[in-house]
């Protein structure tokens, strides 16, 4: 493993860990929430605004950036860091999630995936080698192996095929990876079948990569099933490497995953709901979301959250934000995105602090209560 990607666990509380993941663009203190900048931008936020939220590491998408503006253009600017002027660590997804999300626009074979580009209708071919080459050109600190993300629900035969293809593609990604200053992570698939999750994890772990991800969750399955799949999968991954849960970012989901040893998270949710006029509030009663379109906020002169240190809460009232939302002003999206991203980064920091003081289970008990235990497929 490249020395610059060392992962150090500094504190433990049960299975929960607080650590530091070293990257060429600085350390990442875990647990860590990563905002999503699909098109090399976290929507409506400048890099300076993003940094002020406490964001440490962000995510960009290989598939979309390969289409627009093209990996060669990004590389010509010195990679993503120079292109988007983000000084901190960056992670790029491989395009594997688009195998799921663009299922009506793609065909899969053992060599790779052919997508039909939504705007032009042009055919775009992605293979493991191409996914790695594009990510090498984009220059992120962490890059992901190309995988097949099956939908939910899916029958066992379909998921088993996705696992076998993911493992074969993974071997090709490892062979194609050329840059020692980028950490390649493998992605565990397997749907809701524990034995398939184990089969996939064992195949990936044998390569001794700098880190591993849990994929194929939050693709339509119920919340209790997400929790169970993560609980089954996390222990299959090396405990001295960072563990990344892809596409998950609510308070409850993060706390539940941290409790079983997950370190990294990403999700589009905080900025997506901000663009629709909603704010996330961090309290003792679990997830809470308020919609500023509601009439009750028109004369509410309090900040969104009186203890939140973000720019939005330091300067503006709910009444002003409600006015911006009702007026469909772009500033509403920016101010709510600042607050929502800051809230999730603050939540991750609170998780870290509780782990360090040995109070994680007590302080986050209201998030750790599970619903009825789902039955996973045999």
Curated annotation (Swiss-Prot):
SUPFAM superfamilies the UniProt entry points to: tRNA-guanine transglycosylase
GO cellular component terms attached to this protein's record: cytoplasm; cytosol
Protein's pathway: tRNA modification; tRNA-queuosine biosynthesis
Active site (record annotation): 93, 266
Cofactor needs: Zn(2+)
Keyword hit for Magnesium: no
InterPro entries reported in the protein's UniProt record: ArchSynthase1/Queuine_TRR (IPR050076), TGT (IPR004803), TGT-like_sf (IPR036511), tRNA_ribo_trans-like (IPR002616)
Cofactor note as given: Binds 1 zinc ion per subunit.
Keywords in alphabetical order: Glycosyltransferase, Metal-binding, Queuosine biosynthesis, Transferase, tRNA processing, Zinc
Enzyme class: transferase
E.C. designation(s): 2.4.2.29
Catalytic activity: 7-aminomethyl-7-carbaguanine + guanosine(34) in tRNA = 7-aminomethyl-7-carbaguanosine(34) in tRNA + guanine
An annotated Gene Ontology molecular function: tRNA-guanosine(34) queuine transglycosylase activity
Record: residues binding Zn(2+): 308, 310, 313, 339
Subunit structure: Homodimer. Within each dimer, one monomer is responsible for RNA recognition and catalysis, while the other monomer binds to the replacement base PreQ1.
Function: Catalyzes the base-exchange of a guanine (G) residue with the queuine precursor 7-aminomethyl-7-deazaguanine (PreQ1) at position 34 (anticodon wobble position) in tRNAs with GU(N) anticodons (tRNA-Asp, -Asn, -His and -Tyr). Catalysis occurs through a double-displacement mechanism. The nucleophile active site attacks the C1' of nucleotide 34 to detach the guanine base from the RNA, forming a covalent enzyme-RNA intermediate. The proton acceptor active site deprotonates the incoming PreQ1, allowing a nucleophilic attack on the C1' of the ribose to form the product.
Listed NCBIfam families: Q_tRNA_tgt (TIGR00430), tgt_general (TIGR00449)
Family of this protein: Belongs to the queuine tRNA-ribosyltransferase family.
Name of the protein this chain belongs to: Queuine tRNA-ribosyltransferase
Gene name of the encoded protein: tgt
């Amino acid at each position: 493993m490249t020395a610059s990607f060392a992962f150090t666990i500094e504190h433990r509380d049960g299975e929960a860990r607080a650590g530091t993941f070293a990257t060429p663009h600085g350390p990442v203190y875990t647990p860590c929430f990563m905002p999503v900048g699909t098109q090399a931008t976290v929507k409506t936020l400048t890099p300076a605004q993003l940094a002020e939220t406490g964001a440490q590491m962000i995510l960009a998408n290989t598939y979309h950036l390969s289409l627009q503006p093209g990996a060669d253009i990004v590389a010509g600017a010195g990679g993503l860091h120079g292109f988007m002027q983000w000084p901190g660590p960056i992670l790029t997804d491989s395009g594997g999630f688009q195998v799921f999300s663009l299922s009506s626009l793609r065909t899969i074979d053992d060599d790779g995936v052919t997508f039909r580009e939504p705007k032009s209708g042009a055919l775009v071919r992605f293979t493991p080698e191409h996914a790695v080459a594009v990510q090498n050109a984009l220059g992120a600190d962490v890059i992901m192996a190309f995988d097949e993300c099956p939908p939910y629900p899916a029958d066992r035969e379909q998921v088993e095929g996705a696992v076998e293809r993911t493992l074969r593609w993974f071997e090709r990604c490892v062979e194609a990876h050329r840059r020692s200053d980028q950490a390649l992570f493998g992605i565990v698939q397997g749907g809701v079948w524990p034995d398939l999750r184990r089969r996939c994890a064992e195949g990936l772990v044998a390569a001794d990569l700098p880190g591993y991800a849990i994929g194929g969750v939050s693709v339509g399955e119920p919340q209790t099933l997400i929790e169970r799949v993560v609980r089954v999968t996390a222990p299959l991954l090396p405990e001295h490497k960072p563990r990344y849960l892809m596409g998950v970012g609510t308070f409850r989901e993060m706390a539940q995953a941290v409790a079983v040893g997950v370190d990294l998270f990403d999700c589009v949710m905080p900025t997506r709901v901000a663009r629709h006029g909603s704010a996330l509030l961090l309290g003792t009663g679990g997830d809470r979301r308020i919609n500023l379109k509601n009439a009750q906020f028109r004369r509410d002169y309090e900040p969104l959250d009186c203890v939140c240190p973000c720019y939005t809460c330091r300067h503006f009232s709910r009444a002003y934000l409600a006015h911006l939302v009702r007026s469909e002003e772009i500033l509403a999206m920016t101010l709510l995105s600042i607050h929502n991203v800051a809230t999730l980064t603050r939540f991750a920091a609170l998780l870290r602090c509780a782990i360090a003081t040995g109070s994680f289970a007590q302080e986050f008990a209201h998030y750790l209560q599970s619903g009825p235990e789902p039955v996973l497929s045999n």
